[in-house]
Amino acid sequence: YWYISSQNKFKPGSSIGVAVGDTPYGPFKDALGRALVTNDMTTYAKHSWDDLDPSVFVDKDGQAWLYWGNGVCYRVKLKDDMVSLDGEIEAIDRKDASSFSGGFTEAPWIYKRQGHYYLVYASGFPESIHYSTAKSAGGKWTAQGVVMPTEKGSNTNHPGIVDFKGHSYFFYHNDALPGGHSYCRSVCVEEFVYGSDGTIPELYMTREGVKQGVGTLSPYRCTEAETIAWSEGVTSAVSAKRGVYITGIHDGDYIKVRDVDFGETGPKRFVAAASSRYHGGEMELRIDGRDGEVIGTLRIPYTGEWENWGEFATDVKSVTGVHD
């Protein structure tokens, strides 16, 4: 299920819609052929764009909740089909200081962890991130404080928090990438540790993000080229024969893959699928940095057309252990 906010051409103002697919990758199709929530259903706020930023949470008992809003925090139960409202829409007063420290602006993110219900949201403008806690998804929220203060950036900041493989991560956005601005944002992530009482510490934007991964990549199985920890210069596209691929490669462009475990014996060859419509080129394989040791150079010849793919190989120096 994919819940989105969109302008509604049949009813004035923003609306909430829902699409369905068989996998998180899609393809998705409109579940209802109409909006799930329209602006005439949410009259607490007087502006037309209050139906933004939907967030869905399914509790342990199977009850699903939809939270959303701009200038007011709305919530409603969903029926078992996940595409029908179950009961009346409730508006939580954005100015209630006991529920929202700093006031609620938009972008609610609701989840449950170790018996605590959390509502993380954007406050003010330029936006900071705050959070509240409750004893149930439909209960009274109690303001807890700031997660991320306002910093120079895109004016807005929207949160998401997940636990993954024993680690806790805070996702947010800013305009830090080249060409970024208020409506051209980049997604960021920071790892953090909850307090013993379940409190969230105050976090700050960094350029480094997560310093240690939760696992390693094997170089002895096929790794898609779009598996990227960092890149410069390249772009992605889709091929009818190969699916997603990396293109627009020029001198100095690179892809970084983190935490590759070469094991104790090390590789002997590197193989890649590639094509070249023009003069071909060479791809250097380096470890631990763009200026790191070259362990191999793969020559990509002219293949005639972009869809004339081939597999090309080169010998590599032996390298062991975990490297980027």
Regions found by a protein language model. Give the residues of each.
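Carbohydrate-active catalytic/glycan-binding domains of CAZyme proteins
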Residues: Y1-H323
